[in-house]
Amino acid sequence: MDEFHRCGKEDSFWQQCFLYPLFFQEDLYAISHDHYLDVSSSSRPMEHLSSNDQLSFLTVKRLIGQIRQQNHSIVLFVNCDPNPLADRKKSFYSESVLEALTLVLEVPFSIWSKSSVEGMNESKSFRSIHSIFPFLEDKFPHSNSILDARIPYSIHPEILVRTFRRWIRDAPSLHPLRSVLYEYRNSPDNLQRSIIVVPRVNTRLFLFLWNYYVCECESILFSRLKRSSHSRSLSHGSFPHRTHFHRKIKHIIIFSRRNSLKSIWSLKDPKIHYVRYGERPIIAIKGAHLLVKKCRYYLLIFRQFYFHLWSEPYRVCSHQLSKNCSSSPGYFLRVRMNPILVRTKMLDELFIADLITDEIDPIVPIVPIIGLLATEKFCDISGRPISKLSWTSLTDDDILDRFDQIWRNLFHYYSGSFDRDGLYRIKYILSLSCAKTLACKHKSTIRVVRKELGPELFKKSFSKEREFYSLRFSSKAAARSQRERIWHSDIPQINPLANSWQKIQDLKIENLFDQ
């Protein structure tokens, strides 16, 4: 891929018009073969790798020739041969072909991605998951409404192929993609009879399709929104599902209550701020209510005419930040007024003025977290701690470490909220559940466990936040921890919890509109 980038802009026309000959380059299949072996070897033992995994370029070219012919189609998703050895061989070549197809399609996408990175300062785009919370901290307090939308991930194969035709001029190179998409659409495993493009599918092809689909949606959406709203400022944060990010905030970011003065924004010009994490884009708007209604209407029409998708009204919800809360990502987000007393001395006279600023106020969803802990059998539905019976076969150190890991992830992720009193209720549930689990393992009571293990039971576990402040901050900074908001850089560890809670919120909204 680096060789294509070195060619410069003068070869970009050749790269878009003559992609199909790349299918017959042996180096391409060698790269896809090595990538497939790396992925498969990490998921299965080494003794299962035999001589059947040797690559034959002639066989692969024959398979690609069958894909090109419209009257034939290779079986990439369904193995009909009852012979397990033939099944495995067919799956091996199918994965190699899919890897090669993905590599070819990534050529124009990588060129477009590089050009977008070079113009990053102009578009004010951030491409890292660690930037989402500072983005919300800086942009959302100056908005008055939020559009909470969801990207539709069910799309017809032909619509997806037509989006590629806008960037790829070599039509024959899209025939294999069309064959693969239609074959997956007609497979017995796919009950939707449409292409489900989601980032959760652990295949390189569908991950690439998701990134391309989202970038295509956003590139058209940004230009149309900026043109229709006459807005001078359209900042957005887009976070592709990749391992290499274009821009990162590597260190911990601290927002102090005392030093929360921000620049005064102009109230004349409407502003639109766009941020997306995963499948949930959020559009923050500063402007009149008519502008919010226009943006919401435009999003529905945009999906219908550009991608021929009918979106239900509940998929684009509008909220006023001063009255309602938005649930993303794993927080209840709202904006509150923060009064600040300012004293000014001029000509031996003291003037006192009250300055009111808006700041984002993330709320920890205590009740949903307790519901998730009840689902995982740490407590009952009312929040009463119970023993984790499935962990009683582990050692005492493993039990303490597992409970400690859960609490550390929760504390790190939700330390961005000023009001962290609810977290100590979660800590109480986890600590008592840990004690009950140890008591159940040793067939004793909590009192006996505390007496045998002593005070080290709870000092060994649930103390990572104190170690965190003592190692990374001074004593003065640790004393100010209750007045500061801290966004940790290891927040992706808690994503499964935030995503599961977000799914519950989405189901509640869908059930509300289905009634």
Curated annotation (Swiss-Prot):
GO biological process, one term: RNA splicing
Function according to Swiss-Prot or TrEMBL: Usually encoded in the trnK tRNA gene intron. Probably assists in splicing its own and other chloroplast group II introns.
An annotated Gene Ontology molecular function: RNA binding
GO cellular component: a single term: chloroplast
Tagged with keyword RNA-binding: yes
Organism: Pinus pungens (Table Mountain pine)
Any Pfam family the entry gives: MatK_N
Signal sequence coordinates: none
Family: Belongs to the intron maturase 2 family. MatK subfamily.
Compartments reported by the entry: Plastid, Chloroplast
Highest taxon in the source lineage: Eukaryota
Protein name as it appears in the record: Maturase K
Alphabetical keyword list: Chloroplast, mRNA processing, Plastid, RNA-binding, tRNA processing
UniProt key word tRNA processing: yes
